[in-house]
Amino acid sequence: MMPSPSDSSRSLTSRPSTRGLTHLRLHRPWLQALLTLGLVQVLLGILVVTFSMVASSVTTTESIKRSCPSWAGFSLAFSGVVGIVSWKRPFTLVISFFSLLSVLCVMLSMAGSVLSCKNAQLARDFQQCSLEGKVCVCCPSVPLLRPCPESGQELKVAPNSTCDEARGALKNLLFSVCGLTICAAIICTLSAIVCCIQIFSLDLVHTLAPERSVSGPLGPLGCTSPPPAPLLHTMLDLEEFVPPVPPPPYYPPEYTCSSETDAQSITYNGSMDSPVPLYPTDCPPSYEAVMGLRGDSQATLFDPQLHDGSCICERVASIVDVSMDSGSLVLSAIGDLPGGSSPSEDSCLLELQGSVRSVDYVLFRSIQRSRAGYCLSLDCGLRGPFEESPLPRRPPRAARSYSCSAPEAPPPLGAPTAARSCHRLEGWPPWVGPCFPELRRRVPRGGGRPAAAPPTRAPTRRFSDSSGSLTPPGHRPPHPASPPPLLLPRSHSDPGITTSSDTADFRDLYTKVLEEEAASVSSADTGLCSEACLFRLARCPSPKLLRARSAEKRRPVPTFQKVPLPSGPAPAHSLGDLKGSWPGRGLVTRFLQISRKAPDPSGTGAHGHKQVPRSLWGRPGRESLHLRSCGDLSSSSSLRRLLSGRRLERGTRPHSLSLNGGSRETGL
């Protein structure tokens, strides 16, 4: 059954909705009653206005004219029109307005009925009429004390045929108006009651009863919104407890850290995703797990068997402190190379300037730091990692070589020993030489100035052009005295440096050799890449090494003197020199692949020849002492070779090395 166009909402919010259409079927008689009452009011209003105007036109008496309730008729007609609109558009506001007008019409109709009825009785009582000119004057039938015109109680009626007919017509009109006003009052009262009942009944039903949706061609099919919950249901549901929705689960952020991603973060200034998450609450991995070392590789920092009585070393005039809370590692920039070329991917630079550095601790700390923009960088000088000191001048253009396999004549110990590494080598001045930011070097405060300051090194040429050393010859510091012994143990649990006793000194000298991890031949890496870096340190009275938890704890040490090493013949500095001028390629093999076997204790060889003995723990000292700092970290292959190559190579290699370019050779 299709609803009529009048089926619309009747809610208090005056909006058409499905709820209004639902109750139209139930309350159709109420709507018909509204329509009927509206029409009756309109009709009564018209009649009241008409009779009142006719009655006022018949008589000339001012009191009767003023008492004709024409104003009640106008209000009654207007109220009826609103009633008809409320039937057409049964909005709550329209119905409420109709009920308000109905109440007003009740009052006006009552007043008009009283006035009209009074005038009708007056016309009925004035029966004695006389024609005076063109006006009929009627007086009451009861004899008055004074004449009728003098008393003012006369009725003047416009003459028709006779005066009695004119008086009767006026009387009938006034009674009609009186009856109409009374009927209007009754109709208006009914209209107000019906409107009030409809308003409150609809609101009461919608409040206490659930709703039913009615869909039809006139209704918005598929577009109806769910009605609000009824008040009755809401009141009944108050006793039911509805638990709140729990918050979403919290997952802590993942902190990823690896050496390769740290290096790439430095190079590209961005974060890299890593498949290995490290949470702040997790314990850091062991040093052996990170570096792929055996447990016995951290027995001691300086092996006493490496001590040789015939060896001479420079005195260390600086104190090495372990800063547990030092600053971040910053990549050391590589100087401009002549010819507009740049270092290759695997070029590494490492230099030792007379300070004992705990490389293992630095490597451990640098790997464990999470995404701080540091990997394997170097920053040295007489200052901490956070202390800025302007460089005196731009470092000279570094000398480079396309091979690390050429031996070099030992330079004077006043100059730092440059590290040979992949493809191109950088020779740095002493004021910008790399060091480890976890280890600070400070001049002693109480013992006077150091006897051997870092000398200024002149710019050098390519190793293929000159076979001289990196420092000018002739700079020879005095010979030192024989130092007392010192043994520096290396702990498994803590990668820092600890001292065995306060009175202990350096007893041993060490010669550590870093060997090539893998020789890669590709379009990017052409040539041999040997990361064998030779560190020379002779017997010398050592500074006291302190284990510090902050960078503020320092201890002054006495000043020492440096002892020069005798210089040998100037060697070649490039692979081209070796191939062109040297007889044989055994030296290239010797520098690329260094033996792991223990050398002959006889120590035969040329002057200055030093055999590197096998360490007590079965591995060369390079893994626990030296750190290869990556010069170009844009490729992940270099770091992968640096950090994981040690686990891949477990074969036996030669370990024999000549400091002064001796003729001793060993096979691969």
Swiss-Prot record:
Name of this protein: Protein ENTREP3
InterPro entries: CD20-like (IPR007237), ENTREP1-3 (IPR030431)
Gene Ontology terms for molecular function: WW domain binding
Phosphoserine: modified positions: 358, 389, 493, 574
Subunit annotation: May interact with WWOX.
Family statement: Belongs to the ENTREP family.
Membrane topology: Multi-pass membrane protein
Keywords attached to this entry: Glycoprotein, Membrane, Phosphoprotein, Transmembrane, Transmembrane helix
Region (Disordered) residue spans: 386-419, 442-503, 550-570, 597-620, 645-668
Glycan attachment residues as annotated in the record: 160
Feature: compositional bias, Polar residues: 655-668
GO cellular component, one term: membrane
Transmembrane segments: 34-54, 67-87, 91-111, 174-194
Source species: Homo sapiens (Human)
Expression tissues: Widely expressed.
Main location: membrane
Gene that encodes it: ENTREP3
Ranges annotated as biased composition (Low complexity): 398-407
Subcellular localization(s) per the UniProt record: Membrane
Any Pfam family the entry gives: CD20
